[in-house]
């Protein structure tokens, strides 16, 4: 987008249905999942395909609203099943090295409907 261009960075984006999108095998150095709230079964499937799609040493950077975000009014889905728990998400990356894990409150400024103190879960993992 415009921010990347202004910084002289090339970014390729795709709009796709994650239920069927082919991420490939050992194709990516990094995968970013920011506030991508999926039903648990689909999330597990997408994460498994994501790890398979990483090259050795590749990383996944993940952030989503945690279970305690419900009712805060600062963003996130209103369905409890779409919110995540850190321990649950850790288990979805078996065999990966955890580089960063956090569950707690932080200020979120992602636009008009996602602003204020939010309970987030962050995880950065590396494929061996």
Regions found by a protein language model. Give the residues of each.
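Short "lid" loop at the C-terminus of a central beta-strand within the Rossmann-like core
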Residues: 19, 37-38, 64-70, 104-106
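Conserved beta-strand signature within the Rossmann-like core of class I S-adenosyl-L-methionine
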Residues: 57-65
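Class I S-adenosylmethionine-dependent transferase superfamily signal
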Residues: 49-54, 93
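Core SAM-dependent methyltransferase catalytic element
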Residues: 109-128
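Conserved SAM-binding strand-loop segment of SAM-dependent methyltransferases
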Residues: 7-18
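A short acidic, Gly/Pro-enriched loop at the edge of an enzyme's catalytic core
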Residues: 19-30
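Short alpha-helix
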Residues: 80-103, 121-122
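A short, conserved alpha-helix within the catalytic core of class I
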Residues: 38-50
